[in-house]
Swiss-Prot record:
Family indicated by similarity: Belongs to the TACO1 family.
Species assigned in the record: Pseudomonas savastanoi pv. phaseolicola (strain 1448A / Race 6)
Single GO MF descriptor: DNA binding
Listed InterPro entries: Integrase-like_N, TACO1_YebC-like_2nd/3rd_dom, TACO1_YebC_N, Transcrip_reg_TACO1-like, Transcrip_reg_TACO1-like_dom3, YebC-like
Name of the protein in question: Probable transcriptional regulatory protein PSPPH_3775
Subcellular location: Cytoplasm
Claim: Kinase is one of the keywords in the record: no
Amino acid sequence: MAGHSKWANIKHRKERQDAKKGKIFTKWIRELTVAARQGGGDPGSNPRLRLALDKALGANMTRDTIDRAVARGVGASDGDDVEELGYEGYGPGGVAIMVETMTDNRNRTAAAVRHAFTKCGGNLGTDGSVAYLFDRKGQISFAAGVDEDALIEAAMEADADDVVTNDDGSIDVFTSFSGFYAVRNALEAAGFKASDAEIVMLPTTSAVLDLETAEKVLKLIDMLEDLDDVQNVYSNAEIPDDVMEQLG
């Protein structure tokens, strides 16, 4: 129930880059649009839209921008049809990588993703080539200082899969994909305010990287995340803390 989240350092690095590059707004506008298109414009009956709404507000997106994105999704305004596509491949050192995209032009997106893999010494694979190495899970994060014992008890009562206490004191609650929203709502009702909540692809095995390979893998991940159509990039890379410190 306690331990170090192996992929937290990569995630935190990515979040800093997202904020720095201003890409986070584009990401959540697309998510709002697709969520509204698939499940309707009422966040009360559309859990995916509610989650996207919370994320957008947390990123300080204006209500007007949010409303326009939702309206575009439910068809109240014209807009290009956006679809969700996934890509799989291997990076340097045999690291498994999954890429989630939202695009209005699948040919453009496929070419851009393939170019990134090729340029950085990786290979874009076929559907299923690395997906079996990942599980789709819910991850609900809480900042350091939360009552650990009470949170663990509430999480177990809500049928969470696991609770992990990280080295910095923050806590991650993991759920099944299907149980994510129920657990999130139960913890919220119990008075626990999450710092983040999302559906993620967690690797079932990890590839521990040395400095040279880590630099190459992170270059590929950065290049993929820089692509306009990319929403999320997941890998099974495990970068030791001392290596991450050298990377800066």
